[in-house]
Amino acid sequence: MDLSSLRPAKGAVKARKRVGRGPGSGNGTTAGKGNKGQQSRSGYQRPVIEGGQMPIYRRLPKFGFTPPNQKAVACVNVAQIQMWIEKGLVGEEISVLDLKHLCNASNQEYFKVLGNGELTSTVTITAHFFSKSAEEKIAKAGGKIVKAYRTLEEAAKVNGLPFEEALLTPKAKVVKVKKEKKSVKS
């Protein structure tokens, strides 16, 4: 017995259905698609065809829009942070990486700390945004706030800076340079 002689058990692997290979196979001619019509053709078919009726997507009015520069923001309450401290999940310093793991968030998300609940522990929290009530509660408990400017994904792409430092450096503002008009020579 060797590797080349090993085979799956009989009946364990079902044979692939080969359609359109002649009428004798039982799946020839129309290849299981029936006769004529849009579903029998190749390529794209609209998922919902309502016949002559006005389709639902045209009956309903257009509504709102999605802003192109929208930021994905994960929110964390002060009460959640206190609970994590009591459970021993975080220490006195809470970084953006800690928030990412505890909130099960992605690398593209910004983090905002909200002031719902009470905070009794002294902590240093690094996040992108803080509500006024959260700032007050953290300061009242003797903690500190550190503002991050980049997402984890953006910080990883910054060359020449350590990861933690890249998180805390503000992004350079984009300055549009006006081109001078060329003078027409006469």
From Swiss-Prot:
GO MF annotations, alphabetized: rRNA binding; structural constituent of ribosome
InterPro entries cross-referenced by the UniProt entry: Ribosomal_uL15, Ribosomal_uL15/eL18, Ribosomal_uL15/eL18_sf, Ribosomal_uL15_bac-type, Ribosomal_uL15_CS
Origin: domain of life: Bacteria
Stretches the record annotates as Disordered: 1-48
Coiled-coil positions: none
GO biological process: translation
Keywords carried by this UniProt record: Ribonucleoprotein, Ribosomal protein, RNA-binding, rRNA-binding
Signal peptide interval: none
Gene3D superfamilies: 3.100.10.10
GO cellular component: cytosolic large ribosomal subunit
Pfam families documented for this protein: Ribosomal_L27A (PF00828)
UniProt keyword Magnesium present: no
Gly residues composition-biased segments: 21-35
NCBIfam families associated with the record: rplO_bact (TIGR01071)
Function: Binds to the 23S rRNA.
Subunit architecture: Part of the 50S ribosomal subunit.
Family from the record: Belongs to the universal ribosomal protein uL15 family.
Official protein name in the record: Large ribosomal subunit protein uL15
UniProt gene name: rplO
